[in-house]
Amino acid sequence: MSKFLSFFRSGFLAVADLLFPRRCVVCGETLLLYEEHFCMHCLAELPLTYFWTYKETGAFVSFYGRVHLESLYSLFYYTESYRRAIHSFKYHSNVRLGYYLAKMLGERIGVSDIDYIIPVPLHYRKKWKRGFNQSEIIAEGIRAGIVAAISKMEQKGVSNDSKENLSTPVVLTKVLGRRKFTGTQTQREKMERWKNVEFAFVLNRRGAKKYNLNGKHILIVDDVVTTGATLDACANILQQNFNCRISIATLACVE
């Protein structure tokens, strides 16, 4: 039965591709049946940061003196060509693409001691207009990637001591809130970005009191890190209220 369903699905996708060809989000070329979101060439050329392999990155160092970070992860550099992937996700409701990239990042973060994943909150007006909070999609994708990495490790066989360290993070969407409508940060200069998010975020005490965040390792996620103003503001609120460790993850990073 499963072979029949697989054959039927492949046939359906083949017909759908003929009627409604899928395009690579970077170059616009028609995708082959086995390709997803990116053509093979553009996927191979994805400008990975490899931040998950070392700590002292330029983006990580830029937070010195502002907030103490455990780690900073970004999947790829926000280049002229590959920013189209972020735009497709955020502004054209390509939620599957955002989840796909986030899961890819989560698999690279791999097994860790992260307890909670907190997405940067979106103002209700912007969420209503867009229909979703992109950071929440990213958070769920990263979690799925980490779970997949844990599953692979368990299949390989690990000791009982190691199993105790296999932590499956929980996504928390009600801990931080956004009380100030700030508009887009895209066209703003560095100092404008900082002023734009000043007092924009607030701790949702009703949501936070359900969880003991003291002593926990929290991963804050967003789509792109540029100056770090938004992520810095969120991290400061958490560290001012809880004795917690903070890491940051984004799909893309401006060089």
What are these regions (language model features)?
Residues 1-255:
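Glycine-rich phosphate/pyrophosphate-handling loop used in enzymes and phosphotransfer proteins
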